A protein has these predicted regions:
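Cell-envelope and extracellular/periplasmic
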Residues: 1-233
């Protein structure tokens, strides 16, 4: 797997192990460091009235031009029987986070129109990185979470706890990321009832003096890597 995505390989490996050595076919359609617009088909961009807004920002040749990667790497496989999609992207849209949720939702719907309307779509919420400007990444994560909460047959895994070095935009613990994605597929696509794949999500909060009491949907208790919480988004 030297030239294949580590996250995707670990995803497939766990599926294979949990499903009794069932052969798992993986298609690697990815290009690192790209924005979401090149992965959206032209019809979706026009229909959602996003084309003019994004054209100037993504002008040029592949992999930056609108729809370029969809045309080259997704459209050629639409006649395959695809069981689902694993998506790990978002960092390149950090500075234009305002429209990410709309574009992500539209892209998923566009792919479903091309493949099939119940296409499962499991994705990774972007991880912390010291190079992100201000609060942009937090706003983008929020939009990713909104898509998972509102669009059927989607699932989001959190990987913020898998970052050992905040100066490295590429988390080193890729096996765990792939396995968390696999757990999401095992639970929702393969109906493995004994697997709990969901990451902690904000349920509610209340202010108590100088404290903010946060309630999450986590199963069990949460732990902090350090003795005190230094960051909260």
């Amino acid at each position: 797997a030297e030239d294949f995505s580590v996250v995707a390989f670990c995803f497939g490996k766990r599926l294979n192990e949990e499903l009794g050595n069932l052969p798992i076919g993986l298609i690697g359609s990815y290009w690192g460091g790209t924005a979401i617009e090149p992965w959206m088909d032209e019809f979706t961009l026009r229909h959602e009235k996003l084309e003019e807004k994004t054209k100037a920002l993504t002008a040029g040749w592949a992999p930056t031009a609108n729809s370029s990667l969809y045309n080259a790497m997704i459209h050629p496989i639409i006649n395959y029987t695809i069981a689902g999609v694993v998506w790990y992207q978002g960092e390149a849209n950090n500075e234009r986070h305002q429209d990410y949720g709309v574009m992500f939702d539209a892209m998923i719907r566009g792919w479903r129109n091309a493949f099939h309307h119940y296409l499962p779509f499991y994705f990774v919420q972007i991880t912390p990185w010291s190079g992100y400007a201000d609060k942009n990444a937090a706003y983008l994560r929020e939009q990713q979470a909104d898509v998972a909460a509102t669009l059927r047959n989607t699932g989001m895994v959190v990987a913020g706890d898998l970052v050992n070095d905040l100066t490295d935009i590429h988390p080193s613990l890729k096996r765990q990321v792939g396995e968390r994605l696999a757990n999401m597929a095992l639970k929702n696509s393969y109906h493995k009832e004994d697997i709990q794949p969901y990451s902690p999500m904000l349920k509610s909060f209340r202010v108590d003096g100088r404290k903010v009491i946060v309630t999450t949907t986590a199963i069990g208790k949460l732990a902090c890597k350090d003795k005190v919480i230094r960051h909260f988004e």
